[in-house]
């Protein structure tokens, strides 16, 4: 975006009345707010015109490479103008989301040669809704199967149609059963899940692959509120049908997302650290503060930099879906190992903290430092 050029306003001098100075500055802020909003309205009108041009050219609504370029320009402009690039990213994410909604309001575009009929099982959930918007934005025809506000209440009803691709976005506990039902759908569609754990799916997925079913397994490593995919990752697990895995990847390949292969059997061990351990540490942080009787509203104003960073992350974790977070812990076969490592590490650190010999504590910190900075 071009830098906004606003008319100058005479700012107060040091000799003027303080209250008058404050009023003048507030009026200036109000004027700037109005002009910014006018520019946003102009941007949305332009986005609508872009959407119309895309429809005429039969192009998908979203071009993630363009969005990545927009974000890069925003970060560069913020640095040049002397403010935090993260603020620019936040503003542009909201503008991009609004632009996409504006363009989706019109008839969906078609993707020549690549338009698919896709069914999302569990489509009324947060990730299911995100997937529908994502796939429709690329020009695919998408419907959902969900007893809560789905186009179909069951797979039996959805089975009256044929589908090119079926995406499983149900709660983790339902995935094995849902997979078996999806494999019975007519037309032999591509079937893949997006579950955050795979241990309970390894056997049924591999059996399905050996039976000739086109199955794969993906794991988007981002929240369903994500708008811009730059810097985001989707983990890709091959269940034994490489062609099916590649077909699933194609739905994401032309976006800014990174596709990262990971062996299906190793997925949950990695998630034990990436998800299970990180969730646990943040929940423990909040629980410990609560048990210490330290009220958060009193700590905030005097927070150290480290506390502020940790508290922000812990608060975000605490606000997430507790049912999902329990499933991530419960269904991961590596969870006992994670807690054993956490318990032994905590005990070693406790002993080091209470030991008058600082060398013991320095050794524990050294272990941590060598993990993050091996050389």
Regions inferred by a protein language model and the residue ranges of each:
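Hydrophobic/small residue at the entry helix of a nucleotide-binding pocket
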Residues: 126-127
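NAD(P)-binding Rossmann-fold cofactor-contacting core
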Residues: 136-155
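Interdomain hinge/lid region at the active-site interface
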Residues: 298-374
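Rossmann-fold dinucleotide-binding core
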Residues: 197-201, 205-258, 271
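Rossmann-fold NAD(P) dinucleotide-binding segment
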Residues: 158-161, 165-208
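Conserved N-terminal Rossmann-fold NAD(P)-binding element of oxidoreductases
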Residues: 119-122
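Internal alpha-helical scaffold of NAD(P)-dependent oxidoreductase catalytic cores
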Residues: 233-315
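Extended, charge-rich alpha-helical interface modules
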Residues: 4-7, 11-116
């Amino acid at each position: 975006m071009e830098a906004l050029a606003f008319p100058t306003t005479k700012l107060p001098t040091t000799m003027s009345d303080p209250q008058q100075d404050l009023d003048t500055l507030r009026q200036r802020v109000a004027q700037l707010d109005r002009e910014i909003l006018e520019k946003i309205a102009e941007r949305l009108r332009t986005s609508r015109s872009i959407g119309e041009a895309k429809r005429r050219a039969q192009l998908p609504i979203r071009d993630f490479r363009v969005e990545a370029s927009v974000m890069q320009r925003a970060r560069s402009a913020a640095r040049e103008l002397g403010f935090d690039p993260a603020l620019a990213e936040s503003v542009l994410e909201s503008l991009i989301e609004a632009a996409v909604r504006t363009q989706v309001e019109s008839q969906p575009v078609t993707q020549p040669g690549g338009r698919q009929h896709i069914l999302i099982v569990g489509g009324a959930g947060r990730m299911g809704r995100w997937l529908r918007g994502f796939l429709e934005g690329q020009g695919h025809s998408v419907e959902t199967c969900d007893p809560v506000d789905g186009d179909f209440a069951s797979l039996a009803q959805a089975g009256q149609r044929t589908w090119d691709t079926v995406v499983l976005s149900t709660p983790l506990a339902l995935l094995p059963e849902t997979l078996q039902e999806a494999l019975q759908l007519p037309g032999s569609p591509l079937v893949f899940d997006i579950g955050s754990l795979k241990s309970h799916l390894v056997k049924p997925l591999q059996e399905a692959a050996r039976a000739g079913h086109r199955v794969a397994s993906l794991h988007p490593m981002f929240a369903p509120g994500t708008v811009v995919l730059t810097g985001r990752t989707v983990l890709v697990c091959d269940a034994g049908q490489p062609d099916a895995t590649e077909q699933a990847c194609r739905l994401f390949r032309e976006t800014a997302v990174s596709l990262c292969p990971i062996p299906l059997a190793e997925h949950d061990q990695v998630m034990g650290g990436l998800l299970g351990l990180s969730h646990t540490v943040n929940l423990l942080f909040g629980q410990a503060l609560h048990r210490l009787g330290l009220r958060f509203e009193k700590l905030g104003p005097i927070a150290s930099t480290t506390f502020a960073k940790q508290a922000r992350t812990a608060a975000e974790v605490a606000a997430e879906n507790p049912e999902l977070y329990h499933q991530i812990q419960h269904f991961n076969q590596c969870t006992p190992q994670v807690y054993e490592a956490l318990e032994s590490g905590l005990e070693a650190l406790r002993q080091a903290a209470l030991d008058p010999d600082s060398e013991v504590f320095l050794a524990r910190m050294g272990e941590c430092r060598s993990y993050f900075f091996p050389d």
